[in-house]
């Protein structure tokens, strides 16, 4: 990837966010394996996706950029400071397409919706297509969830603490 902008800031082709790989709760597979979601991911990325997410912790400029995506998605970021939300609202994300992932009911259980942004995941000299997935209901405003056809941890031999970059366009 060419360095066309500051990390965490919008640049002429979109936005770049750098984060630190972290372990999640291990529950994403329950949702990600659902056929209703997989069908939508197939339409979005042209392939089924790995039934799980890769979590990235973000801070500083990268957190502001991620909150700007959350704001575009209509997701409240109640735990963030009003100053941080104000700074995020000044970031221009109008060139980034938000793709709606519809929720559904199955056997009386509600599976919530989400918003996805197409991106490229980069680590070292390699990259793969992915999407930033922002669930309508989430506990963490500073954790970016990434979906991909690849099991990213295995594909890139990632461990907690590795720094990776996603580029949205």
Annotated model-derived regions:
Residues 8-143, 160, 164-166:
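Long, compositionally biased stretches
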Residues 148-155:
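Short alpha-helix capping/helix-loop boundary micro-motifs
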């Amino acid at each position: 990837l060419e360095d066309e902008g500051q990390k965490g800031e919008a640049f002429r082709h979109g936005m770049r966010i750098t984060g630190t790989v972290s372990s999640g709760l291990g529950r994403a597979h329950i949702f990600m394996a659902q056929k209703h979601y997989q069908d939508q991911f197939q339409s979005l990325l042209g392939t089924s996706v790995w039934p799980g997410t890769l979590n990235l912790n973000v801070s500083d400029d990268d957190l502001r950029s991620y909150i700007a995506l959350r704001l575009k998605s209509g997701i409240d970021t109640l735990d963030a400071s009003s100053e941080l939300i104000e700074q995020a609202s000044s970031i221009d994300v109008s060139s980034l397409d938000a793709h709606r992932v519809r929720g559904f009911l199955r056997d009386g259980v509600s599976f919530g919706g989400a918003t996805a942004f197409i991106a490229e995941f980069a680590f070292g000299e390699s990259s793969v297509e992915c999407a930033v997935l922002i669930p309508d209901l989430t506990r963490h405003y500073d954790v970016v969830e990434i979906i991909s056809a690849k099991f990213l941890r295995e594909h890139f031999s990632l461990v907690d603490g590795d720094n990776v970059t996603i580029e949205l366009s």
